[in-house]
Amino acid sequence: LRLDSFSFEVLEQIQGYKKSGLTFAPEAGTQRLRDVINKGITEEDIFTSVGQAIELGWRNIKLYFMIGLPTETYEDLDGIADIAKKITYLNKQIGIPGRFNVTVSVSNFVPKAHTPFQWCGQDKVESFREKHEYLLQKLKIKNVKFNYHDDGVSVIEGILARGDRRIGNLLLAAHQLGCKFDGWSEFFSKKRWEEALSISGIDGSFYASRERNEDEVF
């Protein structure tokens, strides 16, 4: 549910259905970074919306965040853990009995053409892994689960997102090597994609992690 258009009335209408869980998308862990990406919500919006859901009997809350956003610092990652922890405290304050779970789901930022961040470089695999491990330690909180998007998949997405006609050779090589359904981690083969990059002569960092000049043609 969108936190900036959240409606208590909507929850009341759907509460009669099976309460499998609700997903909210703060996107970033601090107000500063939410302002950078123009998210348009405050921490108060987050806790008000989640609190209303808890009061209406929802016991599984999923929070969606993105890491690797432009200007991100480790304070922003700390903010992700802080929000999750505060929600567990909020549930205790409301006092509804029964098991309560918070799932923090993190995806990796992929810059795309025709967006305000199209000139930005994407985090490298090593950076994503370091941040995942950092969050894994920070989110060792009772009743909080952490999962994240495959960093290898994200880097391939970053290469393709702002690729030019030369990427066609990469796609052909990947297909010939048997790559398919690679959007799902269980089908993704980093080894095959690395081989495809080598065969096609494509430098992945040129497309994914390189900062671009504002006058560069996409």
Label for each model-derived stretch:
Residues 85, 91-98, 118-129, 134-137:
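Long, polar/charge-rich, low-hydrophobicity segments
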Residues 1-6, 66-69, 97-111, 147-162:
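A glycine-rich phosphate-binding loop feature that marks nucleotide/adenosyl-phosphate handling sites
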Residues 55, 90-93, 115, 141-145:
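Intrinsically disordered or highly flexible coil/loop and linker segments, enriched in small
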Residues 141-218:
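Radical SAM enzyme core and accessory elements
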Residues 27-29, 109-112:
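Short connector loops/turns at beta-strand edges and beta->alpha or beta->beta junctions
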